[in-house]
Structure formats: C-alpha cells, structure tokens
C-alpha cells in the first residue's frame, strides 16, 4: 500500500518520500542512537507486522528501538475512539444511520472492526455500523441490517486515517458499486463526509500518547 503510493507521488507529482528503510538509513548515517517509531495504522495488520520485521533488521544500528502501537490496541483505545467519534458526529442527534468505512484485511486483526461495532452499539449507539472495503463486515452486510431496520437515510464516513481513494471512490464515488450507490439503490439516502480520522484532534492525541508509550523491540 504505502510503497505504491510513494511511487505514484514520485511519478505523478515529483514528490519524493522515503520508504521506512530509506528513512532508517538516513537516521543511521546521521548518528541517531535512540529510535522511536510511531506508525499511523488503525489496526495491527500485515503492514504493522512488516514494520516490526524491518525494524528488527536495524536493532544493532541503534542503542534502542521503540515502537508505538496502532490506533486500536487496548480496550481504552476503543473507548476513546468511540467517545471522540460521538463528539464529532453526535450519534444521538439523529435517527439516521452512521456507517463507517474501515479498510479491512485478510489478517486476523480484521476482528477489530466487528469488535468496535459491538462496543459502539453496547454503549447505546444502535444506529452506528462498521463496514470494510477488504474484510468483514462488507457493505452488503451493513445494507442488509439497515433494510431490516427500515432505515431511510445514512451518513457515510471513512474509518481510515486519510480520506483518499477508498473514501472518494469506493465510498462516495459515481460507480455503481460505490457504497453510496449500493445504499441508494436499496432506497437509503446516503450523505458522505469526506474527512479522515487523522483530521480529528482527538485521534492525533491518541497517536501522540501511543508514541510516549512506545515499547522497546528486542
């Protein structure tokens, strides 16, 4: 994912961004001794595992290497995310459904998405649902639930750090298989909010806290 985007930015816009390995090489040359890495992933998926493996290759190049956790790591993270999202969207202010688009993955960490939905609903926000682009639940699963509840309107928003291609095309795009059009074909009016999680101050604070709590890799 990230390497493909780095390549595209360089070819299309002439913008050069280091890969993780390139950034680490730069820090080694600069003589850095202590390294703290804070990824901006939502879950502990394949890319997080890959990052750990890359960092392990550099353990002998630094005196210490510490790694922060993704957004959703421990139980308090789920509570903080739900509280923050409710402050942004005010779930009880409307009878409309709120549907969040997660990335999804074939990694077992995909379980974070249904777990998040379960905890949101357990807090009484029974009009809030989580779907994913590449995992479970899919938009068809969410649509089925909304139809069972005779829902007529839904607000769609990304559960991703950046509102990029998935949010603009897979969620809000004009293609017939966009989430917006899938819902509207089912008689559910869909209103899309194109803002990534990274634009919210409370999410930025969560990542800053995770960086402060970064654990040493051995």
Which stretches of residues belong to each language-model region?
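Active-site-proximal alpha-helix that buttresses catalytic centers in soluble enzyme cores
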Residues: 1-218
């Amino acid at each position: 994912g990230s390497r493909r985007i780095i390549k595209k930015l360089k070819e299309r816009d002439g913008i050069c961004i280091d890969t993780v390995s390139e950034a680490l090489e730069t820090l080694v040359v600069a003589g850095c001794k202590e390294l703290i890495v804070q990824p901006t992933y939502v879950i502990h998926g394949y890319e997080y595992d890959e990052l750990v493996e890359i960092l392990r290759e550099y353990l002998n190049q630094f005196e210490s290497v510490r790694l922060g956790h993704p957004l959703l790591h421990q139980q308090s993270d789920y509570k903080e995310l739900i509280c923050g999202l409710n402050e942004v969207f005010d779930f009880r202010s409307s009878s409309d459904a709120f549907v969040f688009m997660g990335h999804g993955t074939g990694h077992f960490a995909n379980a974070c998405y249904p777990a998040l939905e379960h905890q949101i609903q357990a807090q009484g926000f029974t009009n809030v649902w989580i779907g994913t682009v590449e995992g479970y639940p899919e938009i068809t699963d969410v649509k089925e639930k909304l139809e069972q509840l005779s829902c007529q309107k839904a607000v769609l928003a990304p559960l991703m750090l950046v509102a990029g291609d998935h949010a603009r095309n897979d969620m809000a795009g004009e293609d017939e298989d966009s989430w917006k059009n899938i819902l509207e074909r089912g008689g559910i009016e869909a209103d899309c909010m194109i803002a990534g999680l990274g634009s919210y101050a409370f999410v930025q604070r969560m990542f800053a806290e995770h960086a402060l709590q970064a654990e040493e890799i051995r």
